[in-house]
């Protein structure tokens, strides 16, 4: 009752096609797809960078903890 029926959606789609034409809609769809693809690539690049930073920090922490016992042994001697 309060929602949009399939017939109303078809009428809206027909009006949009008549106003813009199929060529314009096709190029608009391609542009939108390219934008979404670029956004996904940027997000995956950020995730990779964050993962690399996290691994580098973990490696640095591990190296620091390995050096600390060696320093303690030298102080005891």
From Swiss-Prot:
Keyword Methyltransferase included in the entry's annotation: no
Family matches, as InterPro entries: TatA/B/E, TatA/E
An example Gene Ontology molecular-function term: protein transmembrane transporter activity
Keywords assigned: Cell inner membrane, Cell membrane, Membrane, Protein transport, Translocation, Transmembrane, Transmembrane helix, Transport
GO BP annotations, alphabetical order: protein transport by the Tat complex
Compartment annotation: Cell inner membrane
Membrane topology designation: Single-pass membrane protein
Region (Disordered): 47-77
Biased composition (Basic and acidic residues): 47-56, 65-77
GO cellular component entries: TAT protein transport complex
Residues that span the membrane, as ranges: 1-21
UniProt-listed Pfam families: TatA_B_E
Domain of life: Bacteria
Family to which the UniProt record says this protein belongs: Belongs to the TatA/E family.
PANTHER family recorded: SEC-INDEPENDENT PROTEIN TRANSLOCASE PROTEIN TATA
Function noted in UniProt: Part of the twin-arginine translocation (Tat) system that transports large folded proteins containing a characteristic twin-arginine motif in their signal peptide across membranes. TatA could form the protein-conducting channel of the Tat system.
Assembly description: The Tat system comprises two distinct complexes: a TatABC complex, containing multiple copies of TatA, TatB and TatC subunits, and a separate TatA complex, containing only TatA subunits. Substrates initially bind to the TatABC complex, which probably triggers association of the separate TatA complex to form the active translocon.
UniProt protein name: Sec-independent protein translocase protein TatA
Highest classification ranks of the organism: Bacteria, Pseudomonadati, Pseudomonadota, Gammaproteobacteria, Alteromonadales
């Amino acid at each position: 009752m309060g929602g949009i029926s399939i017939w109303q959606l078809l009428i809206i789609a027909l009006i949009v096609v008549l106003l813009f034409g199929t060529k314009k809609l096709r190029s608009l769809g391609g542009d939108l797809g390219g934008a979404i693809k670029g956004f996904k690539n940027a997000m995956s690049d950020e995730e990779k960078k964050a993962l690399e930073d996290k691994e580098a920090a973990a490696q640095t922490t591990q190296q620091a903890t390995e050096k600390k016992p060696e320093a303690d042994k030298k102080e005891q001697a």
